[in-house]
């Protein structure tokens, strides 16, 4: 068995921007980019034609949104602006230590998170003092697939050296984290099983 955890809302909370488009626009201006007046609207539109289930990293989306209005973002400005816009304070949720200890008793442990922002997941783990707590960290931006697509979970299972059917995924959103079932694994919802009670739940074989 191996165990993976969702990150935001499961292991940690973070004060992420309430208006991501405005936050990114402000950072783009700081880097000399001429932000279109309707950036908030085009930020919410699709600009990159990706396969179903695939992730489009946020810097690529922002660059494409700007290009749709004929605006260039030189010197990697889109990526730098995105990274700066998502620079939150992070804190652990209750029960994390107990949950990780329980998971470790069963095998390797990973993070599997839908995260479009480069560096954000690892930065959050560092700030929550969880940098060395995992055998692998799989983000949608890096692996190319968003939960609930089963390919995201298959990536985690492969990194941890287990068949997907032996992967237990712990998360807070059945609509995304529950996709582990399509890969043959098991979903544990922290809304019904608190992290502090994960150990006893892992002992139950479905």
Language-model features, listed with the residues they occupy:
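Short, flexible active-site loop motifs that bind/organize anionic cofactors or intermediates
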Residues: 51-52, 86, 111, 143, ...
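Conserved beta-strand segments that form the floor/walls of ligand-binding pockets within enzyme
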Residues: 6, 110, 138
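Ser/Thr-centric signal marking residues that sit
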Residues: 10, 113, 139
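Substrate-recognition element of Asp-dependent hydrolases with the DxDx(T/V) motif
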Residues: 75-91, 96-126
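N-terminal helical cap/lid subdomain that shapes the substrate entry/recognition surface
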Residues: 1-97
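Short helix-capping segments at alpha-helix termini
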Residues: 29-34, 69-71, 106, 129-133, ...
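Short, contiguous strand/loop micro-motifs
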Residues: 49, 85-87, 108-109, 140, ...
């Amino acid at each position: 068995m191996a165990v993976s955890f969702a990150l935001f809302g499961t292991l940690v909370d973070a004060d992420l921007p309430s208006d991501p488009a405005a936050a990114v626009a402000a950072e783009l201006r700081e880097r000399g980019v001429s932000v279109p007046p309707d950036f908030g609207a085009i930020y919410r539109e699709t600009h990159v034609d990706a396969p179903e289930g695939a992730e489009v990293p946020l810097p690529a989306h922002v660059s494409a949104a700007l290009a749709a209005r004929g605006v260039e973002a030189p010197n990697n400005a889109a990526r730098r602006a995105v990274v700066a816009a998502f620079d939150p304070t992070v804190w652990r949720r209750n029960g994390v230590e107990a949950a990780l200890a329980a998971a470790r008793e069963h095998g390797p442990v990973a993070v599997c998170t839908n995260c479009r922002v480069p560096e954000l997941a690892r930065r959050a783990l560092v700030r929550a003092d969880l940098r060395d707590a995992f055998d692998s960290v799989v983000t949608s931006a890096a692996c190319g697939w968003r939960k609930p697509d089963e390919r995201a979970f298959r990536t985690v299972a492969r990194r941890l050296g287990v068949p997907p059917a032996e992967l237990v995924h712990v998360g807070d959103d059945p609509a995304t984290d529950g996709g582990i079932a399509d890969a043959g694994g098991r979903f544990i919802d922290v809304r019904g099983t608190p992290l502090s009670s994960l150990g006893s739940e892992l002992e139950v074989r479905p």
